[in-house]
Amino acid sequence: MKNPDFPRRGALLLCAALALAPAVALAADRAALEGDARRALQKLTSTVPAANALSKDAAAVLIFPKITKAGLGIGGQYGDGVLFKGSKAVGFYNTSGASYGLQAGAQQFGYAMFLMNDKAVSALGANEGFEVGVGPSIVVMDEGKAKTLTTTTAKDDIYAFIFGQKGLMAGVGLQGNKITRLKD
């Protein structure tokens, strides 16, 4: 004899599985992103002494392990990242920006932002996201600045390091990028 509840139970189980599938996929994506971010931060701090020194004093570190930038006259860039306080991942973010002018090409890179105080960390949660260049002071580190930086001379709110550039496109900048927290 057939069980009259079987089709109903099967439909209920199917609906539950479909409802949970996006959450499982999101958790897997975030776990992969966190792993990529941890590896990128470890590589950066092991190869750049200034990044290593800042990581020890930073209130938090926001790292975007892979950002893709492309343009032909009009360009854009996008990537996802992780905010770490100590060794704990406390939030997931994305960064995006648009640009125009003389540009052509595509590239990938990553960047890490060492947030040195609570003011810098709070700016991430303010309003509808954080726009680079508006708010706390940011210093984008190059090789020369990195060699002269010490923990006693580090007085700015945020220090950013760009790393792992691949591809052909002149100029990588952070000015005008918007950083937004991803929903949990």
Where are these regions (language model features)?
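Sec/Tat signal peptide C-region and signal peptidase I cleavage site
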Residues: 21-27
